[in-house]
């Protein structure tokens, strides 16, 4: 009884340690993809926050063209100074196997100098693909996530007001031709290139479906032999995508975002022992205007403004800090926090660590 319990416990621990994931979570089917759509349109119904038509002539031109299509003629030379209209760009993604009559979400972004799109309504806008064919028509009320107010020359704003979203705001009018079901092979594409994972997925499919059913072509592509016909391939892919494979350890990687100052690392990152000295140099410039006036108000003279500039330079830190070898992510974070460096300083420290061979990871700067 004890032996059976220990065997079950060991099997549970081994199963837990080997992290298994479905093939559907690791790959995508080549050719089954989204397609981008774009369009140009008008938003009306704004509460005085639209384009200044004197500075955005394309808004007035678009409005005139739309009115003429509706049978309304605007006299030549009319200066329409409207504040409730804005020219916008509309973008959307056409999903794979999208059918006529289905709805998709659209994103609306101001093109001119409109202050806000809150409360606006997008007029019927054709959405085109790269082949200049119309695949969807967008129209509806815009939902803006930001908020803002202004009065007396002061203003406050939270989030973006010049862009919004229309849920189910476009109707698909044209379907994309699909090659699915044609031929006897399909390619599975890994989300991240990995020779080991590609071969492991091919071996898993071959064990279940028979030798020769799958072949790893490169670090990202696995070619699978499938039966002909749409319904047969759908059933075949449904079975394959639910197969589970053991996930190999990821590559150690540190990602640095220079724009936001953020540093992200995965659990495979390790450190070797090293010593780090980081000096912080700060320069402060203060500029002050001094006003000099004559003492005798009736004796002539002129008021003079003289600028006074003061520059302070401070350098702190610079002490040598020892960083111990760390084999786990928690220890790596603890060692880096012990340096007391800011995120911006940490970027240069990590780059120097990699150059010195102390950081066992790929460094990616975005």
From Swiss-Prot:
Subcellular location: Periplasm; Bacterial flagellum basal body
Keyword Signal belongs to the record: yes
Pfam families (UniProt xref): FlgI (PF02119)
Main location: periplasm
A GO MF label: structural molecule activity
Signal sequence, renumbered to the chain: 1-20
Keyword Secreted found: no
Complex formation: The basal body constitutes a major portion of the flagellar organelle and consists of four rings (L,P,S, and M) mounted on a central rod.
Role summary: Assembles around the rod to form the L-ring and probably protects the motor/basal body from shearing forces during rotation.
PANTHER family named among the record's database cross-references: FLAGELLAR P-RING PERIPLASMIC PROTEIN FLGI (PTHR30381), FLAGELLAR P-RING PROTEIN (PTHR30381:SF0)
UniProt protein name: Flagellar P-ring protein
Native source species: Escherichia coli O1:K1 / APEC
Phylogenetic classification of the source organism: Bacteria, Pseudomonadati, Pseudomonadota, Gammaproteobacteria, Enterobacterales
């Amino acid at each position: 009884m004890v032996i059976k319990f220990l065997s079950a416990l060991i099997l549970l621990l081994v199963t837990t340690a080997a992290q298994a994931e479905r093939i559907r979570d690791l790959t995508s089917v080549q050719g089954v993809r989204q397609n981008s759509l774009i369009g140009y349109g008008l938003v009306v119904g704004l509460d005085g926050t639209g384009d200044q038509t004197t500075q955005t002539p394309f808004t007035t031109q678009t409005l005139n063209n739309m009115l003429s299509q509706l049978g309304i003629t605007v006299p030549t030379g009319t200066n329409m100074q409207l504040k409730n209209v804005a020219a916008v760009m509309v973008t959307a993604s056409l999903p794979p196997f999208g059918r006529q009559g289905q709805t998709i979400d659209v994103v609306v972004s101001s093109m001119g100098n409109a202050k806000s799109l809150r409360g606006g309504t997008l007029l019927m806008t054709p959405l085109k693909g790269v082949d200049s064919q119309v695949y969807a028509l967008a129209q509806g009320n815009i939902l803006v996530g930001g908020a803002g107010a202004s009065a007396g020359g002061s203003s406050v704003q939270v989030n973006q007001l010049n862009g919004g979203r229309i849920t189910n705001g476009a109707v698909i009018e044209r379907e994309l031709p699909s090659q699915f079901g044609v031929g006897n092979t399909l390619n599975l594409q890994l989300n991240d290139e990995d020779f080991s994972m590609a071969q492991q997925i091919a071996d898993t499919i071959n064990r279940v479906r028979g030798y020769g059913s799958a072949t790893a072509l490169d670090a990202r592509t696995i070619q699978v032999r499938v039966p002909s016909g749409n319904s047969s391939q759908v059933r075949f892919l449904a079975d394959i995508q639910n197969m589970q494979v053991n996930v190999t350890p990821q590559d150690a990687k540190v990602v640095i975002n220079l724009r936001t100052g953020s540093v992200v690392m995965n659990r495979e990152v390790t450190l070797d022992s090293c010593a780090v000295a980081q000096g912080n140099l700060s320069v402060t410039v203060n500029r002050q205007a001094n006003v000099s006036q004559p003492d005798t108000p009736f004796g002539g003279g002129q008021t003079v403004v003289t600028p006074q500039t003061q520059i302070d330079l401070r350098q702190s830190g610079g002490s040598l800090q020892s960083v111990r070898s760390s084999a786990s992510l928690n220890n790596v974070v603890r060692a880096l926090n012990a340096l007391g460096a800011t995120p911006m300083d940490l970027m240069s420290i990590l780059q120097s660590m990699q150059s010195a061979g102390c950081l066992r990871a790929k460094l990616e700067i975005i």
